From Swiss-Prot:
Name this polypeptide is given: Undecaprenyl-diphosphatase
Alphabetical UniProt keywords: Antibiotic resistance, Cell inner membrane, Cell membrane, Cell shape, Cell wall biogenesis/degradation, Hydrolase, Membrane, Peptidoglycan synthesis, Transmembrane, Transmembrane helix
Note: Bacitracin is thought to be involved in the inhibition of peptidoglycan synthesis by sequestering undecaprenyl diphosphate, thereby reducing the pool of lipid carrier available.
Catalysed reaction equations from the record: di-trans,octa-cis-undecaprenyl diphosphate + H2O = di-trans,octa-cis-undecaprenyl phosphate + phosphate + H(+)
Compartment(s) of residence: Cell inner membrane
Length: 267
């Protein structure tokens, strides 16, 4: 992998990981459209490290508060709203872990195609638009009980299908349940911390046992670029949705989906 490819793929990963437009789709497309080789396990781990660092550092106050409340609930019986939210985030992570382990081979074999990406990009974009326009948008993330957390967790599990978008699915589910746009995004971002950690750890274990070559320069490029782009993305996304809602991302998904269909039909 060249430094240019590493830079571009890390930039794409960072900007799309937390937007409702599917990071996996944008990482699959370069190989499908431009003929780039697969970036490999080591690079996957690197960009996971970068995006994880971005969300943890951006929400560092919330992360510290949630961790403190979680351990307080375990050892001291803390029943604060922060402790409840921490447990709900853990609950919401479980479905994706189960689905990921059970369905990953099927997804790899049958669903990582540009046709699937184009279809899911359009369908879930329209669903996001409908929910954003028709939901009550009144609750914050601390209103998430176990039923709501499980529902959002199931939506996150569905995002194993390329083109769906993890953040898109979870934000859509949270909006449907009555969360405000900002609360839906925050809950989605906080949910990303355990799932990115687990996914990165799983890929790291595979890397250790695979014997794949490691190029330090491209890996550092991946970490740094994905971190910076993800941090910037989180900051401006939260500001944008409070003013414009989800419409810009729906429009982008529709353009991407139909554009990809047009490209595929011309091949």
């Amino acid at each position: 992998m060249s430094y240019f490819e590493a830079f571009m793929l890390a930039l794409v990963q960072g900007f799309t990981e937390f937007l409702p437009i599917s990071s996996s789709a944008h990482l699959i497309l370069p190989s499908a459209v431009l003929g780039w080789e697969d970036q490999g396990l080591a690079f996957d781990v690197a960009v996971h490290v970068g995006t994880l660092a971005a969300v943890v550092i951006y929400f560092r106050k919330e992360v510290v508060s949630l961790l403190s409340a979680f351990f307080g609930s375990v050892f001291k019986g803390d029943r604060s709203k922060e402790a409840k939210l921490a447990w709900m985030i853990i609950l919401a992570t479980i479905p994706a872990c189960i689905f990921g382990l059970l369905m990953k081979d099927i997804v790899e074999l049958y669903l990582r195609s540009a046709w699937v990406i184009a279809t899911t990009t359009i369908i879930f974009g329209l669903l996001l638009w409908w929910v954003d326009k028709n939901s009550s948008l009144r609750d914050d993330e601390y209103q998430a009980g176990w039923k709501k957390a499980l529902f959002i967790g199931l939506a996150q599990a569905m995002a194993i299908i390329p083109g769906t978008s993890r953040s898109g699915a979870t934000i859509t589910a949270a909006l449907y349940l009555g969360f405000t746009r900002e609360a839906a995004a925050r809950f989605s971002f906080l949910m990303s911390i355990p799932i990115i950690t687990l996914a990165g750890g799983y890929l790291g274990l595979k890397l250790v046992t695979s014997g794949d070559p490691i190029h330090v320069g491209t890996l550092l490029t991946g970490i740094v670029v994905s971190f910076i782009s993800a941090y910037i993305c989180i900051h401006f996304f939260l500001k944008l949705i409070s003013r414009m809602g989800m419409t810009p991302f729906v429009i982008y998904r529709l353009i991407l989906g139909f554009g990809l269909f047009a490209f595929l039909m011309m091949q």
